[in-house]
Amino acid sequence: MDTWMVLLGLQILLLPLLAHCTAPASTLRFVAVGDWGGVPNAPFHTAREMANAKEIARTVQIMGADFIMSLGDNFYFTGVHDANDKRFQETFEDVFSDRALRNIPWYVLAGNHDHLGNVSAQIAYSKISKRWNFPSPYYRLRFKVPRSNITVAIFMLDTVMLCGNSDDFVSQQPEMPRDLGVARTQLSWLKKQLAAAKEDYVLVAGHYPIWSIAEHGPTRCLVKNLRPLLAAYGVTAYLCGHDHNLQYLQDENGVGYVLSGAGNFMDPSVRHQRKVPNGYLRFHYGSEDSLGGFTYVEIGSKEMSITYVEASGKSLFKTSLPRRPRP
C-alpha cells in the first residue's frame, strides 16, 4: 500500500488521541496549488477543483499547514471584474470551505487568465477576506521554522508583468511585457532582494514555468532573465503552474523546479520534452483520468521535502532539497 496513504490512515486513527498530546510542529508546512480557478459558468467550479479542495483539507487536517500558496489562474477564464465579483465566493470561498481550511491563510499571485480581468480587484479582495493575502503584484514573505532559528524567504512574482500575456489557443509563448519599464523594475527588485537574502531557504514563485516538458514548454523569457538569478543567488526552488499537470525538474546547480498546475484541469501533453535539457526531468504526471493534484511542502532544519499528492489522496512522488549553506 502507498506509504502516504498508510501514514494518513494511521494519523486519522490516532487523531483524537494526538490532539491532546502532540508537541508543536518543528517544520514549516504549506500546500502549493496552481490553476485551480473553476469555470465562468454555473456551478463555477469543476469536479477536479472540488476534489483538490477536499484532499487539501484532509491533508491540512492530518499533516498540518501554515499556509496555502496559490500559483495563479485563480479565476478562469477571464479573471474577476471587481472586489465584489461573485466568483470570489463561488470559486474560492464556497469550494475551500472545509473547517480545516477556514483559518489557513492563502498567499496569492496572478496568472495569465487573471490578467484578462482585473488583478487590482484580486489585490483589493485581501481587505475583504481574512484568508486571501495578495498585497501587491509581487512581494516578499519571510517565515521562521517553528522551534528553531531556521528562516525561509519566498518571493512571489508576477510573471505576466515580466514576460507578457499569452493566448493559450494561439501562441504558447508570451511575446513581450506590456510595459517594459514595469518588467525591468520587478526584475531589478528581485535581483536586489536575492542578493540580500540570508535566509536558510529561498523560494521564488510565479505562474509561468521556467522549465516544462508539457503543452506550454519552457518560458523563454524566464529562461533568459530569471533562471540566471536563481543560480547566481543560490535559490532553493522555483514554484509555478500554467501547465495543467504535475512536474519536478532539477538543474545542474541543484535548483528545484516545482510545477503544480493540476488544480482544475489535467493535460497529458509532453510536446516540449526535447526543449528541456537532458536529465532535468525527475517526475511528470498528467493523466487525463486523474482528478488532479497539488504539492505539499515541509521545511525543516536540514531539508525541504516536496510531496506530489493526487486529489485521490495518493502520493505520486517525493523529493527533497538541502538547506542553503550558511556564509
UniProtKB/Swiss-Prot annotation:
Task: State its cofactor.
Answer: Fe cation
Q: Does the keyword Disulfide bond apply?
A: yes
S-S pairs: C163-C221
The main enzyme category here is: hydrolase
Q: Which residues form the signal peptide?
A: 1-22
The organism's superkingdom is given as: Eukaryota
| Functional description taken from the UniProt entry | May play a role in the process of bone resorption. The osteoclastic trap acts on nucleotide tri- and diphosphates with higher affinity, compared with other substrates.
Name of the molecule in the record: Tartrate-resistant acid phosphatase type 5
Taxonomic classification: Eukaryota, Metazoa, Chordata, Craniata, Vertebrata
